């Protein structure tokens, strides 16, 4: 008991220190980009969320857009088979809240930003909502949120779980902390055997662990709609044009691609830049201007009829807009401090996939894609040649599309396995 109390106090102290270290950056985003203004009351516990109705409650949580989006087939199936349950969906980012509201409010879910995990804030929220089940998407577990839910009798599960090599080393160094952090989870449903070994390395019993594959490979029919014609018409791309979508790009990705794009003088090659963070839009624009690349902004009504390069300065459209592409690149993979983003979205839209050398956030998946030749790993030196070959060779592009479809087909049972495990837990509960 004393050890648990001490761990909680040290964890609180760490969060407070982290807040003060990040404060200048946070206030910069508030005053110059208007971020966090709509969510600060809930984040700091000033305003408590309210869930309508009666019945058992399941609380889903994911860090941001990607983690929240993968919950879609799960919530749809849950609603079909257990309609008496109420849903709560939380996320740590405003973009994630925007996405969750778009996807889940029509299912009756209550969506809000996760309050800070300080014991004096989150515990009162958990007590008010009193969830029967808490489900964490991929790995965004928060200690006080988890332990308070368990104290109140909730079941807690991790789905599509993963643990990076960096996090594994950190928790291995603090093995007791790692065990305390994840031990309250009743089940860990993981993407791969490698992640299983890492969780066991930090002290999690193998009895709690199931390996089902990556849920992101599952394509719900309603989510797999390919709107290629719709987006190409909206972007004003002709049938002769070739479109490269650069998704979730960071400034370092832009620097590398700007050099390559400057070689494309052919007006039939169009480039759509989709920033990961809209608050860095000015930085992206300056990099393109420095490289002498003329571009327009989507928000200002620009299209490919006027420009060969467009910046998509809108939220929540990337996954859909991949369908318009002839080639797709996933950003964050030329930035060693980021380590990549969702590699599967282009494949789900039947588009050839490229990614850079820094992909440690999804290293296992990246290696599988390389082995199956379902994705192209490029670096600064090879990028121009690879892109040129794909643009000029439709047969090669189609080959990568077919390999991508085959890869997804082989992996698509991951969702069904995950659902069967969760379903067995739901039906055993006495509500």
Curated annotation (Swiss-Prot):
It is a single-pass membrane protein. The chain crosses the membrane at residues 5-27. SUPFAM superfamilies: UDP-Glycosyltransferase/glycogen phosphorylase (SSF53756). Its EC number is 2.4.99.12, 2.4.99.13, 2.4.99.14. It is found in: Cell inner membrane. Its main location: membrane. CMP binds at residues 275-276, 315-317, 342-345. The active site is at residue 67. One of its GO terms (molecular function) is Kdo transferase activity. It is an enzyme of class 2 (transferase). Coiled coil: none annotated. Disulfide bonds: none annotated. The record marks 138, 216 as: Transition state stabilizer. One of its GO terms (biological process) is lipid A biosynthetic process. Gene3D superfamilies: 3-Deoxy-D-manno-octulosonic-acid transferase, N-terminal domain, Glycogen Phosphorylase B. Keywords: Cell inner membrane, Cell membrane, Lipopolysaccharide biosynthesis, Membrane, Signal-anchor, Transferase, Transmembrane, Transmembrane helix. It comes from the Bacteria. It catalyses: lipid IVA (E. coli) + CMP-3-deoxy-beta-D-manno-octulosonate = alpha-Kdo-(2->6)-lipid IVA (E. coli) + CMP + H(+); alpha-Kdo-(2->6)-lipid IVA (E. coli) + CMP-3-deoxy-beta-D-manno-octulosonate = alpha-Kdo-(2->4)-alpha-Kdo-(2->6)-lipid IVA (E. coli) + CMP + H(+); alpha-Kdo-(2->4)-alpha-Kdo-(2->6)-lipid IVA (E. coli) + CMP-3-deoxy-beta-D-manno-octulosonate = alpha-Kdo-(2->8)-alpha-Kdo-(2->4)-alpha-Kdo-(2->6)-lipid IVA (E. coli) + CMP + H(+). Pathway: Bacterial outer membrane biogenesis; LPS core biosynthesis. Involved in lipopolysaccharide (LPS) biosynthesis. Catalyzes the transfer of three 3-deoxy-D-manno-octulosonate (Kdo) residues from CMP-Kdo to lipid IV(A), the tetraacyldisaccharide-1,4'-bisphosphate precursor of lipid A. Thus generates the genus-specific LPS epitope of Chlamydia, composed of the trisaccharide alpha-Kdo-(2->8)-alpha-Kdo-(2->4)-alpha-Kdo. NCBIfam families: PRK05749.1-5 (NF004389). Belongs to the glycosyltransferase group 1 family. Glycosyltransferase 30 subfamily. PANTHER family: 3-DEOXY-D-MANNO-OCTULOSONIC ACID TRANSFERASE, MITOCHONDRIAL-RELATED (PTHR42755:SF1), 3-DEOXY-MANNO-OCTULOSONATE CYTIDYLYLTRANSFERASE (PTHR42755). This is 3-deoxy-D-manno-octulosonic acid transferase.
């Amino acid at each position: 008991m004393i050890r648990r109390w001490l761990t909680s106090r040290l964890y609180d102290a760490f969060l407070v220190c982290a807040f003060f270290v990040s404060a200048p950056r946070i206030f910069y985003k508030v005053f110059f980009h208007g971020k966090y203004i709509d969510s600060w009351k809930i984040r700091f516990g000033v305003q408590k969320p309210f869930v309508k109705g009666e019945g058992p409650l399941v609380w889903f949580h994911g860090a941001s857009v990607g983690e929240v989006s993968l919950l879609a087939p799960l919530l749809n199936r849950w609603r079909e088979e257990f309609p008496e349950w109420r849903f709560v969906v939380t996320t740590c980012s405003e973009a994630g809240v925007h996405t969750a509201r778009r996807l889940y409010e029509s299912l009756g879910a209550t969506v809000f930003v996760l309050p800070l995990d300080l014991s004096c804030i989150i515990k009162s929220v958990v007590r008010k909502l009193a969830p029967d089940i808490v489900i964490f998407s991929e790995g965004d577990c928060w200690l006080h949120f988890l332990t308070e839910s368990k104290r109140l009798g909730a079941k807690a599960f991790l789905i599509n779980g993963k643990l990076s090599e960096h996090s594994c080393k950190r928790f291995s160094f603090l093995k007791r902390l790692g065990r305390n952090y994840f031990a309250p989870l009743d089940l860990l449903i993981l993407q791969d055997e490698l992640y299983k070994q890492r969780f066991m390395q930090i002290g999690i019993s193998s009895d709690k662990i199931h390996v089902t594959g990556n849920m992101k490979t599952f394509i719900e029919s309603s989510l797999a709609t390919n709107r290629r014609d719709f987006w190409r018409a909206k972007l004003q791309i002709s049938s002769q044009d070739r479109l490269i979508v650069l998704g979730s790009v960071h400034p370092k990705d832009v620097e590398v691609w700007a050099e390559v794009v400057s070689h494309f003088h052919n007006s039939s090659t169009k480039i759509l830049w989709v920033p990961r963070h809209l608050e860095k839009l000015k930085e992206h624009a300056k990099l393109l201007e420095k490289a002498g690349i003329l571009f327009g902004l989507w928000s200002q009504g620009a299209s490919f009829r006027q420009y060969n390069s467009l910046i998509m300065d809108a939220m929540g459209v990337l996954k859909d807009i991949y369908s318009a592409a002839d080639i797709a690149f996933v950003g964050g993979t030329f930035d060693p401090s980021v380590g990549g983003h969702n590699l599967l979205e282009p494949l789900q839209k039947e588009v050839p996939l490229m990614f850079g050398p820094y992909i440690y956030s999804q290293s296992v998946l990246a290696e599988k894609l390389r082995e199956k030749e379902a994705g192209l790993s490029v670096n600064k030196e090879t990028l121009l040649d690879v892109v040129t070959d794909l643009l000029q060779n439709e047969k090669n592009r189609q080959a990568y599309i077919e390999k991508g479809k085959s890869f997804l087909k082989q992996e698509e049972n991951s969702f069904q396995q995950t659902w069967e495990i969760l379903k067995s837990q739901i039906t055993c509960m006495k509500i």
